[in-house]
Amino acid sequence: RGVAALADIENIQAWIETPTKYEVPRIKKLNSRASDFGVAWTSNNYNEIIFSSTREGGITKEKDAITGQSFSDFYTSRQNKQGEWEEVTLLDEDVINSAGSEGMPFMNKSYTTLYFTSCPNHKKRTSGCQIMKATRSGSTWSDPVTVEIKTIDSLDVIGHPTLSSDELKLYFASERKNGLGGKDIWVSERESTGDKFGRPRNLSDLVNTIGNELYPYLRNDSTLYFSSDGHGGMGGLDIFVTTLDSLGEWTEPINLRHPFNSIGNDYGITFHPTEERGFFSSNRDTKNGLDDDIYYFIEPPVLFTLSGTIKN
């Protein structure tokens, strides 16, 4: 472990000195004094999002015994024509949001179905966290239902869903029997969208480690982003990327480096489908490490300077 720690220190120094070209501003209007995290676009105009927050004004005033914070609910905001984010409001008060915690939203490609993690607040019985889904017609959401996966029941703790574009492959995070240690990323498949998902399988021993792999995000069906504290990096959870090779195997994960990653926890990345911009969450600039914030990232345009002599 001492050798690994030394390597991490060297990574931190090198990556801070030579950051990637992305800009990662913190979005003040979306963040609060509580934790704000887990963003998903909710329309193909890419000007409206939902995200999770433990801010005041949620469904319940109770505190989560595990985190000491309020339970998280879904909130929404819209970007106006000037590019500014408008007032943050609760997504709803009695359909998707509950007395428990809702988090890590994922919308299908038609923006009609929301998949998310739900951790109920049952006072008299034990329950785990499950993956739920709800469909939208106009501005109205259906009641959420549990996404059925073979061998998984209500006592299991699973979450952080991301799906293939045809919704036949479901990737999620869980600490399960036959895993590699800590929480791993798993994948489950089905034949059609009306079927139950099959028995989960561990994604890859190249991706998963004896540490924790969480917050998977599938982009264009062949690129998977996730966070890990088991691959080494800048500290805490770092964001990594792996791709499918020509044989359909996941490649060795690559650290996204600074400024995506920091000495804190960096996670929950989501991309615009065709542009190099999106969101992620981090506790990098917080005093107690509990106030996670939402960051926006964008690859700025490359500017060229031309010089020369004009002759007749």
Predicted regions and their residues:
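Short, conserved micro-motifs composed of acidic
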Residues: 1-309
